[in-house]
Amino acid sequence: RAGPRHILKRAIEIAKSKGFDSITISPEIEFYVFNQNVSKFTEIKANQGYFIAPSLDVAKEYRKKLSDILMDCGYPVKYHHHESGKSQHEIEISALSAIPAADFCSFFKYIARDIATRYTFDITFMPKPFSNEAGSGMHAHITMLKKGRNTFVDETDPFGLSQTARYFIGGILAHS
């Protein structure tokens, strides 16, 4: 009853009891790709940054294969590309309901590692494997709808944030 899946289900039930129609999440996962070798995670695959040219992006075929498999499994890949760190990559999927989005995150790590071995790559989801490179994160683009309206948006606010969005952010910070 204290597992993450149960906690998420409970949070969804609470949101519905407060009049929210749905919670959708679009996960965006960043990771580093390395050549497989004895001293793991030392050989960086590329030395260019964000959105490098395809001819220089030696892991693009890996990302494409991973994205194709994810789509075959029903996960709508929004995009994939090289990130700003050397050998850092990112895949984002389109918004899903909260529980399928959470399931995707677990599935993604498993399948990404499995496919990497076919390309003789190792990967890591460590937040900061190198002190001199960009850190990796897992961004969650979250939307909560009420009567079909995004409750996080307030066009009259200078930052476009509603009071609901501010409380939501505060809740994340308080419970992290």
PLM features: what roles do these ranges have?
Residues 1-176:
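Glycine-rich, acidic/polar active-site loops that bind/position phosphate-bearing ligands
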